[in-house]
């Protein structure tokens, strides 16, 4: 009835499941580090999959993408998020990050971290 082959037929649904898994993993690591995970969505339709904020107010922004083919789109979204921050009211994020299902973790030339989900917690 089900199985991995069914998910490959519906890659959008697989992406939703991956986002849920990655958010769960971020939540586990956040709690262990006295931080909280939020979802960001503003009145202009800009969305960021996860914001991890420490008690002191420092935070990091995360986009979660199953496939590496969505990295550029995710990076542009994170940059737009950062550009829209009113720094008279809040600080910029300490880091911008993209969690992916595959690939090697690395820092892009623009400073955005691309993190393979298998690297979380290491």
Identify the residue ranges that each predicted region occupies:
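A cross-kingdom feature that marks ATP-driven nucleic-acid transaction machinery
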Residues: 1-122
